[in-house]
Amino acid sequence: MAFATINGIRVHHVIQGSGPTLLMFAPGGFRSVISRWTAQGGKREWKEMDALAALSRHFTCIAYDRRESGLSGGRIEPLSWDLYVQEAKGLLELAGATQAHVLGSCMGAALALAFAVRHPQACKSLLLHWPVGGYRWMMKGRTFFARHLDFVRAQGLAAVVARAPQGENFWLDPEIGPWGSPAAVYPEFASELPKQDLGRYLAIAERSRDALFNDTMPSGASGAELMKIETPSFILPGNDSSHAYSASLALKELMPNAQLWDLLPQQQSGANTLAEILRFTRYFESRASALS
């Protein structure tokens, strides 16, 4: 297992494969971990495909556990899209790359959009797989934050630490909140969490909720920001309560250089998803080679 400290946070990551660099933002909501790219952990999104193994045959893949997820650490501060992409930029630099194709799945697509807004020169293309958004996604996030806030008000932060090892992460057990995962992994984080001023902690959690689940638009970028993303983008749509088809349509409408795959999830397979990713990225690789 490889770890790097970026922005003061210990980040569990993997860099493997060969070929053009592919920066990968994992699916899973607040379970955004490397294993969600594997055959076992990612079978919902990738069907029969082991995505990391398959993509590593064509790309130099950079995958990681997002901060406050899996084996990565965290910090108690207002969470935002700006914070979420800082570790990714650091990992890109760690890999010695200045540019990458950027693949984001589920909530990872929101991070891919946020990354493109802040680092457009680092993005060769955007691959947005099952982007999150819509009313039901917003209400899921806000409801989970409400459950955490109610739990902390009733039982305190020590109860979060006690419950975290069984709950594993915020998306599986909302009561433990966004910082339950690092509390379950890192003893020093677990010892510091109960010492937080309760009012300050609750305010930080509320600010995080309002930054990440503020409207029914596709998550990760505002409408105005989406209209300024010039990066060539390929949208692989979802169609359920978290990955609303309307979110993919909104991205296609607002992003000036976006294409929308005309297959819904029930028609998507690991094989045809991989084929579309390779088709889209190879076009830009061949064009870049012709210009060099």
Language-model features and meaning:
Residues 6-73:
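Conserved HGGG/HGGXW glycine-rich cap/lid loop of the alpha/beta-hydrolase fold
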Residues 82-100:
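Conserved acidic catalytic loop of the alpha/beta-hydrolase fold
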Residues 104-108, 112:
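Gly/Ala-rich beta-loop-alpha elbow adjacent to hydrolase catalytic centers
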Residues 110, 117-118, 123-155:
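Flexible "cap/lid" loop of the alpha/beta hydrolase fold
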Residues 180-222:
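Hydrophobic, aromatic-rich cap/lid helix
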Residues 229, 235-237:
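Short beta-strand/loop motif that positions the catalytic acidic residue
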Residues 241-247:
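Conserved alpha/beta-hydrolase "acid-adjacent" motif
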Residues 256-292:
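Catalytic active-site module of serine/aspartate enzymes centered on a nucleophile-bearing elbow/loop
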